[in-house]
Every structure is written in C-alpha cells, then in structure tokens.
Amino acid sequence: MMRVVLPLCLLLASIFAWGSEAAISCNAVQANLYPCVVYVVQGGAIPYSCCNGIRMLSKQATSASDKQGVCRCIKSVVGRVSYSSIYLKKAAALPGKCGVKLPYKIDPSTNCNSIK
C-alpha cells in the first residue's frame, strides 16, 4: 500500500508546485482530476466527480494556450512520479470512458506544443 500512497502524494505535491502561464492553473487541473485518483489506483466504478472534473477541464480550456497548459501540467506530473503502466493506461482511458474528447493523450510522450 505504501508503494501506491507515496507516488500519489508526490503526484499531488508536484501538481501544487507546478505553475502554468495559461489561464487554467495547475492547481485547477489538480482540483478537477483529484477525484480520479481513487479509480486509477483502486479500480472499480469511475466516480461521477472524476468525469465531471474532466468535462470541466475540457470546457474551461478553450484556447490553444489553455489546452497546452493543461497538457503540460498532466505531462509534467506523469513524468516526475513513479507509476505503474497499469495506472497510466487507466488514466489515459478516463476521457473516453467519461465521454470527453481531449485534444491530447494522457501520456508522458505527448507533444503539448502541437495542440491547437
């Protein structure tokens, strides 16, 4: 259990510490995606609040700059935290499972600069 909790704590701490020039702060990204952590780690049903958070990010990130900022925040966190490939696959599948189309993949190799 500690192997799961420590990376999640680091994930959340790095989200709070990371800033963005876009109108949507990394703190806002964290607040919207925080309800998804339980699903990614433990599985089960996806909480409504998780899908709602993904929808809110999609609606709030209207400009290319906003979308790139959200992408960079997610990518930065994923790149700095030790995680299992299973967690990454679950996280990457969330937008589709919530019926939300994001202009980028939740993946450490995503090129956020290419988002329009």
From Swiss-Prot:
GO terms for biological process: lipid transport. The keyword Transport applies. GO terms for cellular component: plasma membrane. Disulfide bonds join C26-C73, C36-C50, C51-C98, C71-C112. Keywords: Disulfide bond, Lipid-binding, Signal, Transport. GO terms for molecular function: lipid binding. Residues 1-22 form the signal peptide. Pfam families: Tryp_alpha_amyl. Belongs to the plant LTP family. Plant non-specific lipid-transfer proteins transfer phospholipids as well as galactolipids across membranes. May play a role in wax or cutin deposition in the cell walls of expanding epidermal cells and certain secretory tissues. PANTHER family: NON-SPECIFIC LIPID-TRANSFER PROTEIN 2-RELATED (PTHR33076). This is Non-specific lipid-transfer protein 10. It comes from Arabidopsis thaliana. The gene is LTP10.
